[in-house]
Amino acid sequence: NLKGKVLKSNFKFDFIYDKNYLKIDNLFFRDKDLSFKSIGLIELKPFFKASLNSEIKEIDLIKLKKLEYGDFVKLKPFIKRLNIQNNIVFKSKKFSRNLIDNLNLKVKTAYGRLNIEKNIFILDTKIYCKNDINLLDEFPILYFNCELNSPNKKRLLKKVKIDHKKKDDRLELNFLGNLNILNKKINFDSVSLKKNYKATEEDLKYFKKTFENIFLAEEFFKLFQLSKLRKFIIEIS
């Protein structure tokens, strides 16, 4: 059993060490902005590789918004060496004001390339996304391919405080594109609703312009703000 403290962060975990691997059980990390539990196996030889399962207990996205790209650049030599697979789970506390109820992530990092599969649950709505990005590029581009499936559009929009008149209106949305984080530019390759709508080139340009004006005019991480999401939905509706 190992306990420790780094700056204002506390951690503890049980482990079994062998010259070729380190098995971790009951890891618990906590500071004022983030706490999580984790178990997994870290292979030390012949190459470093980590396979983990983690559960986020608490996270403060306000701090995430304060991250600067300069801080990230300093980590690039370290990121290049990472070879990690991590399954991450987050469940919102009952009666919390979080938009997201449950979040499941499958994260793979190798040689600077990050691949993420996301399952996001908001009430009875499910959002599935596949993302990939090369973190070592001078201008990293995040590619996304997402599906939103909601059996009740009215209930979903009510969650983001938008009034919707129709009852029990199903919503099935697909959107594909890429986001240049540093240049604050987004491109939509396709946007479609099942059966009855596929965005034209003019529509895609309008979505691009609206998204950039609302989400990317300020710091990138401000796109987490619910007010901006609400404004974007109203603009494109």
Kindly give the residue locations of the regions a language model identified.
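Membrane-proximal interfacial segments on either side of biological membranes
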Residues: 1-123, 127-237
